[in-house]
Amino acid sequence: MKKASWVIHLVFWFLICAMVLPIAAATKKLNVVTSTADMAALAQEVGGDKISVDSIAKGYQDPHFVEAKPSFLLKLREADLLINVGLQLEIGWLPPLITQSWNPRIQVGAQGYLDASQFCEILEIPQGTVTRAEGDVHPLGNPHYWLDPDNGRRIARGIANKLADLDPADAAYFQQRFEEFNKRLSAAELKWDAEMKPYRGQKVVTYHRSFPNFARHFGLDVIGYVEPRPGIPPTPSHTIELIQLIKRENCKVVLVEPYFDLKTPQSIGRETGAQVIVYLPSVGGEKQVTNYFELFDYDIGLLIKAFQSSH
């Protein structure tokens, strides 16, 4: 009797497992890790509830310089898909993490590795040989491409296609999510373009070269940078030249990323009367900016307020 009872229990648990395991497999989400919060925001738009997504760099951090932590390795070891910005933006910290994760799915060239720059229109691609004397110039072009909504659309489409490759059963879901995102983005672009139209041609100065895609899309003229060269801290001589340029060009706005020191920009503002604005290059730079649409709403709102008050 004991043996029969044991067999019955074994069969019972086998049947339970047979029913539960397919359900668990069917409901398992793709585990997506991104290098930046912007890639995470776009992945969430098209992945919906079929993915879990986490970013390594947060929106208030400089994505060029991220301090590696053991927790990052834990995230990468469990990832089904890694999405990075590329163009060597993360070259100082991400490659060692990928290697040390020992996750074959996300190694460079593997099915679970996605460089989003391949989908985008890239600006400021250097001509000729690039040397360290020119600062931290990206030899493959400017990596801050997500600040153009057209590139955001391209990235989202590329991510949706990659998710479909990894999870063919949900391919139609990812395509539908992209189409819905595309409709909302097209409507938002019409609104943003209309809001910015009166300010096309306005001159601005930025701290770092993180603004060219945004500026080109909305018709702004970036006349100079607080950095004398990319990644090089401000120098007294360059600051004096920049102050003279701002006065000569009647520039009214200096834009600074949230992770740079405001001391030099504020001194420039005092000397020229230009407004110094901390704008957000990434989702999550402020708590209320939680998605791709809110990023543009926030930055455009700041710019319009600054342009209006300068007249």
What annotation goes with each model-predicted range?
Residues 9-22:
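Bacterial N-terminal signal peptides
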Residues 1-11:
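Bacterial N-terminal signal peptides that target proteins for export
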Residues 5, 19, 25-27:
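Intrinsic disorder/low-complexity segments
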Residues 25-311:
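Extracytoplasmic metal-acquisition and chelation regions
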